Amino acid sequence: RLWRVKLILGPLAADLLVQSTPKEKDLMVVLDDGRYFLETEVCSLKGVGRFVLGLYDDIDVFDSPELEEYLAFRIKDMQQKISKGRSVTPTMQMEIQRTIEQTQEAEDVADNT
């Protein structure tokens, strides 16, 4: 199944999209305000969803109900994950702290040699 998505991209999002998928440049239309309009089809909402969420402040979703629903689900899931403290477990916190300490120790040794 293919999903039709319409996005309004700021300069950063447009540049990153063209770098990763150059063929999309042919589908982009420059708007009067300098942003870009893109209408395309995707085989999965996961990739475009990750792109939109990663650059949410530089992308507007336009007339794409399936993508909007997917994004709302991912945002809700992330909010629940954060509110339940699932994002970093105590064990993970300890591992992160150990890694930071080991990195600092290695940097100190390198600085002293």
Q: What are these regions, as identified by a protein language model?
A:
Residues 1-113:
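Polybasic (Lys/Arg-rich)
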